[in-house]
Amino acid sequence: MRRLNFEKVVTRLVEFIKENAKQGVVIGISGGVDSATVAYLATKALGKDKILGLIMPYYENKDVEDAKLVAENLGIRYKIINIKPIVDTIQSSLDVALDRKSLGNIMARVRMVLLYSYANSLGRLVLGTSNRSEFLTGYFTKWGDGASDYAPLINIYKTEVWEVARIIGVPQSIVEKKPSAGLWEGQTDEDELGISYKLLDELLWRLVDLKMSKEEIANELNVSEEIVEHVEKLVKNSEHKRRLPIGPKVDDLIIEP
């Protein structure tokens, strides 16, 4: 895995937020390490008065307490909004059956609507919390948690986020908890991805950044080519999530007068 100077990484992330979000930000705080890290960085960059944290649970669990811990440690203003009535209303209005992944996508998009509603009313920007591991594998909801004005962690792998979090003082209990999108009880990122973040990041760095072949990666990491192919497939199949909608070109169809 690449070796970063994490002290300098923190400085650069803080400078990025300070330069691009002077008017203040709204952040969705889930109780996980990514959103906690962004909240800590933003507070360091802008001061606590320019941060609003939204805690938006669908069901009550320990994540809410962890999210409150982050906000209260930082002294930032925060609101707890129960999204269950909103999500359930949408679900009951549809004449199609939804599996739990589809329901999870609705939750993520409802949270996006709330974040932007507050950001618009306050004249602020939305800071995203996605990391590079999620971004490259498409492990986010399109127009949901993937939607933001700026994403400070977008080039920081998940295993690197843990290092940044430790440096800036995120509570150890949050750094060490199992990563979860909180979409349903017992859900974890690594179960859904089918691979640990530690191995995933090693594979992604070699596959995407170093552009090594599958054979080279498998040999270097002593893993099967099937695992490398699994990650490669995650990257390829989620390409549409990483770009704006596209359509066919028509410039060549101009009729000369």
From Swiss-Prot:
Record: residues binding deamido-NAD(+):
109, 142, 149, 240-241
**Keywords from the UniProt entry:** ATP-binding, Ligase, Magnesium, Metal-binding, NAD, Nucleotide-binding
Q: What is its EC number?
A: 6.3.1.5
Recorded catalytic reaction(s): these are:
deamido-NAD(+) + NH4(+) + ATP = AMP + diphosphate + NAD(+) + H(+)
Q: Which InterPro entries match?
A: NAD/GMP_synthase (IPR022310), NAD_synthase (IPR003694), NH(3)-dep_NAD(+)_synth (IPR022926), Rossmann-like_a/b/a_fold (IPR014729)
Q: Which SUPFAM superfamilies match?
A: Adenine nucleotide alpha hydrolases-like
Annotated ATP binding sites: 28-35, 129, 158, 180
Cellular-component GO terms for this entry: cytoplasm
Decide whether keyword NAD is in the record. Answer: yes
Zinc listed as a keyword: no
Q: Where does Mg(2+) bind?
A: 34, 134
Catalytic class of the enzyme:
ligase
Pathway in which this enzyme or protein is active: Cofactor biosynthesis; NAD(+) biosynthesis; NAD(+) from deamido-NAD(+) (ammonia route): step 1/1
- Disulphide bridges: none
- A GO term (biological process) for this protein? NAD biosynthetic process
An annotated Gene Ontology molecular function: NAD+ synthase (glutamine-hydrolyzing) activity
Q: How does it assemble?
A: Homodimer.
The similarity annotation says: Belongs to the NAD synthetase family.
What does this protein's UniProt record list under function?
Catalyzes the ATP-dependent amidation of deamido-NAD to form NAD. Uses ammonia as a nitrogen source.
According to UniProt, the name of this protein is NH(3)-dependent NAD(+) synthetase
Identify the species of origin.
Pyrococcus furiosus (strain ATCC 43587 / DSM 3638 / JCM 8422 / Vc1)
* Gene field: nadE
